[in-house]
A protein has these predicted regions:
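Structural marker of alpha-solenoid helical repeat scaffolds
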Residues: 83, 117, 151, 184-185, ...
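N-terminal leader/linker segments that initiate helical-solenoid repeat arrays
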Residues: 1-78, 82-83, 292-296
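TPR/TPR-like (Sel1-like) alpha-helical repeat modules
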Residues: 218, 224, 228-258
Length: 296
């Protein structure tokens, strides 16, 4: 999968000409840092238009990208584009790699090149939106996601990313609506369901948030996001013993949930759950320090 750092929209989509667009991170487990990737299709030259070595070069570049070997993938995409400058998929994929390497402006430029070559394909808009989010260009990102949703109102990735944008703008009711719509559009999209629950937490609807988080944990017992969210919620509601039990599991699954800055900037939690989890960690040091696997 392709992962970019520093923010958490669901996913840019990887180009593989001739493939059908796949769904993104359906179980939600890959969405907890950067961008959870969907191995789908960015627009571009059909596979049949590449002969032997050129097709192999494209596949090498794609494989390196999916493996997270971004520094190795970038020059491979450069070579592909030297041979096929009209290949929209290659432009979009190179843009994804540039974003993963921290070059959001370069990523936006590459996605624009992809759009100019295949104006009606949604993936470059999704990918450009993630890069715009990395730069805090919320309105520009929202415009890209809405462009997709005007054409496909059930695009779960665009709905989820628009929810993140709404949250960044402080509109948590709209964010929750988008997350819930993303979860309906893609059954099994656990991160969307968790984000909707956390938005309910932010809005003071603790019973609804607790119901959603418990349902997620029953279905995905190893889903750290839901366990960390339920830890914060239970602490806020005064159920400290059960909060500690869930924290043992959450922190063992993913220690980044100890980091408030990561929660706010990368995972994109709302502020109220972050504050509650910080209070839990400050006032329940025995839970924060307990070795993984030791239950209260």
């Amino acid at each position: 999968t392709l992962l970019a750092s520093g923010f958490n929209p669901v996913p840019f989509r990887a180009g593989d000409p001739g493939a059908t667009t796949a769904t993104a991170a359906a179980d939600g487990t890959a969405a907890a840092d950067g961008t959870a990737a969907a191995d789908g299709t960015a627009a571009g030259t059909a596979r049949s238009n590449r002969a032997g070595g050129e097709a192999a070069l494209f596949e090498r570049a794609l494989a390196a990208s999916r493996a997270g070997s971004f520094a190795a993938a970038l020059p491979l995409w450069d070579q592909v584009l030297e041979l096929h400058p009209e290949d929209a998929a290659a432009w979009s994929n190179r843009g994804n790699v540039r974003l993963a390497l921290g070059d959001a402006a370069g990523a936006i430029a590459d996605q624009g090149q992809a759009m100019s070559r295949d104006p009606e394909h949604p993936d470059p808009h999704l990918n450009r939106g993630t890069a715009e989010e990395a730069l805090g260009r919320w309105q520009a990102a929202a415009a890209d996601y809405r462009w997709i949703l005007e054409r496909d109102p059930q695009d779960a990735s665009a709905l989820y990313n628009l929810g993140n944008v709404n949250g960044s703008l402080g509109d948590w009711p709209a964010a929750r609506d988008c997350f819930a719509a993303a979860a309906r559009a893609r059954p099994g999209f656990a991160m969307a369901r968790s984000s909707a629950a956390l938005a309910s937490f932010q809005l003071g609807e603790l019973e609804e948030a607790e119901r959603q988080l418990r349902a997620l944990i029953r279905r995905y017992p190893l889903f750290a996001d839901a366990r960390a969210g339920l830890t914060a919620l239970l602490w806020r509601r005064g159920a400290s013993g059960e909060a500690e039990s869930h924290w043992v599991a959450a922190s063992g699954l993913d220690p980044r949930y100890r980091q408030p800055d990561w929660l706010l900037r990368v995972r994109r939690w709302p502020p109220e759950p972050v504050v509650a989890l910080e209070q839990f960690l400050a006032l329940a040091p025995q839970a924060a320090a307990r070795p993984v696997g030791v239950t209260p």
